[in-house]
């Protein structure tokens, strides 16, 4: 069984589903994406994504017209496998098409671009043996880039808050449940991180705080303070 948390950007709410590995992902139409496919190589019992990521998948799948193999999707930040600001940790990124021909990957990429639903579709020249697309959302905290995570603060709700909570727990700054809600305890934990790395302790996770926190937590493995 897996616990799947879905953030709905339209209502700013998070919903939790308890599903088996062969169940369809919430909001994915038909059986086009099962929990085990979204999980990929992650060993986490808890997964998360957004309604808009699933909608983008649905549009791409319909436009392409047949099955799309998913090589990698979800990862928790302490599991690593991707960069320090990867959208895979937010549950909105997919690396697909590893088992088909180059021409078929081009067709998948073209379908993804044509939907206009993804925040980013990687050029085929950068990923010639797979297709990458993600449904990033929010304005990146660091200026001059379209990558990275948005600023989150007390009252924020999102899968980016889930990344923050997961990193704080893994590093032992807090033991908050993974609910995707930035509350007072999370604010205090962010201040503790900021003090530890000589940043202004304002309790807001912006550009520099994200950089320090993700660099310290990405790929460190499951620690004794990780919470599922």
Q: Where would I find each of the regions flagged by the language model?
A:
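Intrinsically disordered, low-complexity
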Residues: 1-42, 139-159, 166, 171, ...
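Surface-exposed helix-capping loop/turn segments at secondary-structure junctions
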Residues: 66-68, 173-177
